[in-house]
């Protein structure tokens, strides 16, 4: 078992002093070239620094998947550096899982235009979740964010990588994963979340304004 933290900011390392975490150096956004940015799809009014951060994040996640493939790693947990694991004993709940499984994130409406309406029914959606591994129903909800997920082996990592991008131009990594939910390639999440947000850091993230992070997402 390995637990990788995709770490971009030096000052975020201090909360990962537990030796069970392994720091995976992220791509730094200022090193991203405009030619790389051009390969991605963005809203027309997205700022260049935001675009570079999205690309750096995506490349970092794909690099971890590549490491799993190249080194034939098994039972790998991938977290972003604004997420933490508080109950390590829960990792054993993934024992025997043979596919991609979210261990953290945020449930959202199937369509972005319904984001605000979904907030009113989110609790009723959660009532259908059971403790343990659940199945994503893309017609009812989607799982956003890529703050924490489980990859059991290199076959699954390769399957994910080979399906990115889903369209002609690549999207943010969590958007790519949402597309794979719709295709039935990503179908599982564990409830409640194992990886929760460390809000002081999460609220500084470049996607905060999009997702309005109000809690640690223990209940997604």
Would you name each region that the model predicts?
Residues 1-79, 83-220:
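An acidic/histidine-cluster motif and surrounding catalytic segment
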């Amino acid at each position: 078992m390995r637990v990788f933290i995709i770490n971009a900011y030096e000052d975020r390392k201090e909360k990962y002093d537990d030796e069970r975490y392994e720091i995976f150096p992220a791509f730094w956004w200022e090193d991203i070239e405009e030619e790389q940015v051009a390969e991605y799809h963005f809203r027309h009014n997205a700022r260049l620094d935001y675009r570079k951060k999205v690309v750096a994040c995506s490349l970092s996640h794909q690099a971890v998947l590549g490491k799993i493939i190249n080194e034939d790693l098994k039972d790998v947990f991938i977290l972003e550096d604004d997420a933490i694991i508080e109950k390590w004993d829960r990792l054993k709940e993934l024992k025997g899982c043979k596919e991609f499984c979210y261990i953290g994130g945020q449930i959202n409406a199937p369509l972005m235009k319904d984001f605000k309406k979904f907030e009113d029914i989110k609790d009723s959606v959660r009532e259908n979740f059971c403790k343990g591994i659940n199945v994503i129903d893309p017609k009812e909800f989607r799982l956003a964010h890529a703050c924490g997920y489980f990859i059991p082996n290199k076959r699954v990592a390769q399957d994910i990588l080979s399906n990115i991008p889903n369209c002609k131009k690549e999207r943010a990594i969590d958007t790519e994963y949402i597309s794979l939910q719709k295709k039935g390639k990503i179908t599982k999440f564990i409830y409640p979340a194992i990886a929760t947000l460390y809000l002081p850091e999460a609220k500084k993230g470049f996607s905060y304004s999009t997702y309005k992070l109000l809690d640690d997402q223990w209940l997604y």
